[in-house]
């Protein structure tokens, strides 16, 4: 025996090594999961939930969104819950629990993004305390269907839509198949039962040339490909995520931004550099959603602006 380690190994048997966790198992730890009872609530939230639920007999619909490193940032453990017609997002901030509750009618807008396995939902509105609030949670998009009931609730969509009527409205978007098949599918699947398509404008990705190297032009993306879809109930903005990579000119995934018409205060149109025009959806005095279009789309965009103004005045 040449050293202390040899002596130690001879006296004591080696400790058993823990089983290695496969990459798949590690990935599954980041998946959201349905919580069925108070005993399944993570320790950090359990006392809060016991007090919060009180004598409630029926356990609410709760989903745990675990800590996840997202496409652009990292999210801590969060619980998403529906109770008494209210959507709650509960999270731990330092040593306290924060719960933002949103009634559907007080939600200003909601964004749903999916890029490969990275998914996120951002809710903006007035919480139950009457304070402006923003809640965001990340999730593995392989389990994105878990959150569909929350989006349905937020958008006040019927759980059992008239399929014949819905297919009639979806057919109005079939023209997109000749422009961008991915966006057609996104648009058709974004429609909810009971709403009517009023107008839509499609804009391919907009680039500008910033220089050249060895005779090859260098370009910069000014605006991702996007579609503005107006229904009689909401504005739906569907767009590529410009920071995502693509394959054969098609970027992976996309973002859907749902804005109920009650949240739209005004709409404006302005000329921009590079022969572009900007359509602005004003949600409040200091916040708006801007969409860039080529000047060649001006007639379509003007028609869209007129349709929006008519609907928000009704």
Question: Can you say where each PLM-predicted feature lies in the sequence?
Answer:
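Long, mid-chain structured domain cores
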Residues: 94-99, 107-117
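Intrinsic disorder/low-complexity detector
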Residues: 1-74, 84, 112-227, 232-233, ...
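N-terminal beta-strand/beta-hairpin edge segment
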Residues: 85, 91-93
